[in-house]
Structure formats: C-alpha cells, structure tokens
Amino acid sequence: RGPLWSVPHDNENAGFEAALAGVRKHGGVVIAVDSGLAEDGKRRNAAVDRGRPIDPNRNFRDGYPRYANTVLADYRDGARPIIALHTNSRGFDTGTSRCNQSDRPGRGEVSIRFCDDVMQPHPSQSRDWPFDDDDTLAYVAWRNGTSPSTSWCGRTLANADFNVVFERVAVTDGSLSNYALLRGLDYVNFETQERGLDPAALAQARNRLTAMIDRALKLCVRR
C-alpha cells in the first residue's frame, strides 16, 4: 500500500512537497497538519478547542489516545512504514552539545554534529550529496537498555553511509518517534535544512528529502 507520510509542522514546506512527491512515486497516505486559518503556515497548531497552540509532534501521549489513533489510523490499515518529514534550522546549539562545541553556534539539536546522552550521531563517511549538509539526516529511535542496532532500519541506513542520528528513548517526550518505538511501529524521520520559500531553495530542500526517501525504501522495505 505504501508508507504513512507524516508532516506535522505546517511551516515546513519542503517536507510537505517531499510527501507529495513520495506518495506519487511510492503510494501510501499523507497526514499533514494545518495550523489553522488565522495562523496558517505556523509550527504550532492553533486549531484547538481551548488553550494555547500545540506542537503537533508533542501530542503523542497516553492521555490523548484519540489524537494518536486518528493520525495513525492508516498504519493499522497497512500504510507503513511511517516516514516523518521535517526541516530544521541551520547548525545546532553548541552550548547544549557534548561534541563539536567550537562550531558556529546555531539553533536546536538537529545536526549530525550534535551529540548528547540522547542523540548519538553516525555521520556519513563519504559526505556525498545529500549528506554534504550536516542538517540532512535520518533519525531512528531505540529503547534505553537495548542497542542502537535495534532501531528500525538504523543499522541498514548507517551501513549505506547515510547521516544517521540514533535517538535513545527512556521516557517518551510525546513525539511520534518515541510513540512509534514504544509501540513497535516501523518509523523513520528524515530531516534537512530549512531553506525558505524561494522556488529554487525549496526544491533543493525537497530534493534532499526525496533522495533519502528513495534510497531508504529500497534498503528497508520488502516489496
């Protein structure tokens, strides 16, 4: 049937374009979050009944079963694996990383050069495109107390010279990656640098994502 494509952030347009390209080529179902009419194109979803806008990728918790069940309904009907698609800020927060602290400061944790007790990077050795960009990578999750090699397709992607970050999960952070791991669902997240809405830049980001998708599906999914 094809993958379940997940695009939880409405401001990550390359992820949405990659999902559309993916479903045309590989089939499956796209689940994308619309952040709301008044606040369209935002990371947080304002289309809530009450309270503040939420991060749609931090709502996969036991207290909200209806949300997860709705988002993942097609997985139960055979749309798999889950392929999450994201874009991220350039670089990483060197103040919170345990490695490469002399790099140019950036934002967040999404980089093959970031590491801590949770995020453990396995960089591409050749750095061939699309992995010439440190912000272009695959995330795979593994359960604390086991081995990174138990992550879904993680070892295969690392052996194929992807940039791979192995995420150690002890307690869920409410993300889809954690939820999928703790429930035994096949899941991988592909990330690339956010390059804006200029058509050429948007295409560049989308193409990095689709390059990872195409290779990973050949490597990880039996047809």
Language model features: what each stretch is:
Residues 1-223:
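Structured catalytic-domain cores with a bias toward divalent-metal coordination
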